[in-house]
Amino acid sequence: MVKKRGKNLPAQDSLDAEPVCKHLRKALDEGSVKKALVNVEWTVCQECQADNKEKNNSDDELVEDPSVWLCLKCGHRGCGRNSASQHALNHYNTPRSEPHCLVLSVDMWSAWCYLCDNEVPYNRSSRLGQLVDYLQRKAKAKSKSTDSAALDEEVKAEIVAENEVKIEDQEEKPKGQAKWDKASSTQNNSTEPTVKGLSNLGNTCFFNAVMQNLSQTPAVRELLNEAKTLKKPVTVPLPDSSSPTNVEVHLEQQPGPLTLAMWQFLTEMQETKKGVVTPKEVFSQVCKKAIRFKGYQQQDSQELLRYLLDGMRGEEIQRVSLAMSKSLQNTLDEEEIKKIVKDSEKRRTIPNFVDHLFGGELTSTIMCEECHTVSLVHEPFLDLSLPVLDDVIVKKNSQKSSAPAPERKEEEENDDGYIKERDEASPGASKHLQKKAKKAAKKQAKNQRRQLKMQGKTVLLTDVAKQECSEDEEEIAPNNTESEANTRPDDEVPIADGLNTMKSDLSALENGSETIESAMERVTEDTDLDTSGHNTESVEMNAMELVRNMENNNNNNTDVNKTLERTEGSGVDSMEATAAVDNGNADTVCVDDTEAANGLLDCSAASMDNELTNSLNRLKLSSDIEPTQVEIEILPDQQQPHTQIYEVINEDPKTAFSTLSERKDLPLDGYSVLSCLYQFTHKETLTGNNKLLCNVCTRKQASRLNNSNKGEKTFVYTNAKKQMLVSDPSPILTLHLKRFQQNGFNLRKINRHIKFPEVLDLAPFCTSKCKNIPAGESRLLYSLYGVIEHSGSMRSGHYTAFVKLRRPNQQLCEMVLKGVIPEVSGSEPGQGSWYHISDSHVQAVSLSRVLSSQAYLLFYERML
């Protein structure tokens, strides 16, 4: 009995049946390409090579090596459109009977169709994928042979040159002077910057690109050398409540395994004479911190960078905390020591080299338009994730209601990313696939109904939230204070997501669809939300306000999921709210959600609701209280949280949103990093569902109601203005361009070129009271020294690095190590040469080639 061929075909065959590019069949000729690439130089444009031979260029003239594109019809090798000659584009424009529109970049291994003017994912076509695999194998084999030959010649030349120098020195100088010069030259050579390739351990290009940029950050090596020094005195500021203000500890323990592996890697990159380094030890330590990187799968460079920095940060904080406990054990009790160490970790007063180099601070300013009360929310960051807007998204959203289904499918094919509905079945799919798609659609609808049902049940908490916890009344009542203002989160990532999840878990428990253990596990996980490098909202100080804003947390699902995943192996965020006004008295309310969780696990199911409600009620402050200093702290079950400071200030509303320099003259032309920063820091208006819960206006209305003998209290929501600016710039500024976007089940990558400058002025995006800036300075300049580029699509791609080889910035190192800020900032970037590194392949490039790359991560260092 013969089986039907189409019945058990895999899902990938349905993708191959409909290639992205409709010109693929006529524009691809495997035989001609293989014949044309016999005994030729792959990485050189054949027309430029012929022109150079005719012109006989001199050796002192620097000729740029542009990117080479291979015609997949005839095997022609031409330079790209970013070069001066554009031989590949001219080859396509030459009239022929058959199109030569399909080309392949031999540097990035990405296919492009000139007719479609779009990238072609070669993994969706068996013919194109097999040809690209064949070319990659041939290119690797050829590069290994040429690299080994070139390496032998370089080694021989170095040996001859060293022997000649030794002979001349021995003849001209005395013996003692020659020995001293030899030792000093060896030391100078070890600190001289170098560029080396990295071995690909198996789909680890995302890791290699990050390590290349970190290896060209000289301050990292200086800080690691200092951290490796044992018995080094470290001064740790203690909380204000303790008797001593500072404590000096001596670090007698070695740094953690990840920190040591990083130090060994940077030392090998700087001192080894090998052309290629294998970063196996560092990668294995990262995999131990975050098991998601195991298995040699394609990963994200920005996530790898965050896991790496957070891992080293957590190890250093743990080492300093142990030294603190040991130094205080002779003067304080064990319980007091634990409290001090825990409070220091929560307030982020424990010094560590990661925060010193990459850490900065953002300030979100919120002003009520009714009473003009100004509140500030301070939060730290390690990198800035900038939104990348694309006109394709706006166009598709505007045409969703009017365009029919066939036109939508045509738009998806012409788009520059991969977009596919998860519940969509192809027209030629089998009955099994169609049935599977229907089940997925039903499951999605069921989940949506359950979410709506859960949101409806959480409204019941508003009545419970009005009651005061007895413990909090005893602690707050003596001072009769009240917090000034609360904010409702807008459509960005909210810091109250963990508390919203607690209320959702309570509704699930009422419905009987979830156990206590699973609910509390998700509560402790969701409250550990990492807010570094992402937009976060102000601290929620009222349980009723949190309940009413659960429906506003659905827009940035990708960032929330991404951030939650980062909490597996690193320190996580906590919130510290501080309201400072005229009265100097202070009260503190501490809520430990992990301790509450442990207590709830011991309770029965009947007492679960009451305990969880009490934990939520602790966030609601008494309405009888005058404004003083109030602190709300949620202590996570992690080593080192990121801290947020909420304060209400008396400031002139006219200067509340002032910046370090004017924003009017910014060149916001097209798609650029300046446009992304402007969008990230633009002033918003909180209206509608995002209105501000202002306690000042609420207190005024409550006083009027009391005069009219109406006992029921109502909360006042007002329109407000909000702006997020940089208040403490980091020495190393890392910018993450969010090219990968997810809207529901739609996945896409924005392949559009984003302009980025060599010198970036961050002053228009900083507050007027920015820290660590000389007095009277109106500029904050950063110099570009590293770029991570991603080429490819959502489903497959390749990460490469551009690094600037330069001498270390001594002023920046002194600022990071000693905290010395020079009075005058630098105005010109340091001299250096740029290199493009793709795993083990290193190539010198020009600055124009760097600025034309498709950047995903940008590394800037402060100019001092």
Curated annotation (Swiss-Prot):
- Spell out the Basic and acidic residues composition-biased ranges: 162-182, 406-425
Reaction catalysed by this enzyme: Thiol-dependent hydrolysis of ester, thioester, amide, peptide and isopeptide bonds formed by the C-terminal Gly of ubiquitin (a 76-residue protein attached to proteins as an intracellular targeting signal)
Tell me which residue ranges form UBP-type zinc fingers.
19-139
Task: Please give the record's comment on domains.
Answer: The UBP-type zinc finger binds 3 zinc ions that form a pair of cross-braced ring fingers encapsulated within a third zinc finger in the primary structure. It recognizes the C-terminal tail of free ubiquitin.
Q: Where does Zn(2+) 3 bind?
A: 71, 74, 91, 100
Indicate the quaternary assembly: Homotetramer.
* UniProt keyword annotations, A-Z: Activator, Cell cycle, Cell division, Chromatin regulator, Hydrolase, Metal-binding, Mitosis, Nucleus, Protease, Thiol protease, Transcription, Transcription regulation, Ubl conjugation pathway, Zinc, Zinc-finger
What the entry lists under InterPro entries is as follows: Papain-like_cys_pep_sf (IPR038765), Peptidase_C19_UCH (IPR001394), Ub_carboxyl-term_hydrolase (IPR050185), UBP16 (IPR030849), USP_CS (IPR018200), USP_dom (IPR028889), Znf_RING/FYVE/PHD (IPR013083), Znf_UBP (IPR001607)
Q: What is the scientific name of the source organism?
A: Xenopus tropicalis
Name this protein carries in UniProt: Ubiquitin carboxyl-terminal hydrolase 16
Where is this protein localized, as stated in its record?
Nucleus
Q: HAMAP family of this UniProt entry?
A: UBP16
Q: Tell me its EC number(s), please.
A: 3.4.19.12
Might you name a Gene Ontology BP term for this protein?
Answer: chromatin organization
Domain called USP: residue spans: 196-863
